[in-house]
Amino acid sequence: MDNILLNEHAQFGIFIEADIKQANQIQAACVKALDCLAAIQAKFPQHQIGMTLAFGANFWQSTQYAAQSPELKNFPSYGKNHTIAPATQHDLLIHIQSNNYDANFTLALDVLAVFGSAIDVKNETHGFRRYEERGLDDFVDGTENPHGDEKILSTALDEHGGSYVLMQRFAHDLSKWQQYSVAEQEESIGRSKETNEEFDKAIRHPRSHLARSNLKENGVGLKIVRRSLPYGTASGEHGLAFIAYAARLHNIEAQLQHMFGDVEDGLTDFLLERLSQAISGAYYYAPSKETLRRL
């Protein structure tokens, strides 16, 4: 997981969600999957490949290490009316990223082979980096991420070396988005489209994405580590494969509650009205490699 977190600018990602069918085979499969990762890392050392194996509450709470993650729960739906974050909880998340698509794909094939019939894959999404690290909305993405190894690891990892993970897919309606002026798009984000400069709080709209997601509690920022990437096809569904890591699930959930209007002011994120629709959502816990080998 450290390689996932510390590679801040990975060019490609694969996100696989599955349900567990044979729980008694998972520990051995995890060990073999870690061996697959080590082999690919040795073969392609220049590509900075990393992998996370993370588990939903239904499986994780049956293990001897459940106490490591007291906040873990199944993803509930958030929001109301037409602004909903649907719950599509699964048992296993496999997150692979690197600077080379072939390395990712090779590792994904190897890992799925070792899990075999023990899992039932429900979704596989392939992400890619765009120019200047912009999303399909043409705004720079991930600016609020912590930077530098120390800040990244302290934000993402708990005292056990594990991390809470949020996996969502947001489908973008680019035709709708392009009908808004640049000024309206910037109002939606809270930043300049060209320069990525953050708007001052005095002029920032309370429904801007920055206002809804850049949160503080008792003066302390509720930071998360994002490793999201655009995904999809030009002719079909496309959007953002959103994945976030945090030492506390609370940090992740607070952002969702503010984006989807589940807080006192009831305001929702402009992006959910003007650009994006959440089409999936799941919480997972990613244990350390040492814990994975002892499941």
Tell what function each PLM region has.
Residues M1-L295:
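Long, histidine/aromatic-enriched segments associated with O2/redox biology
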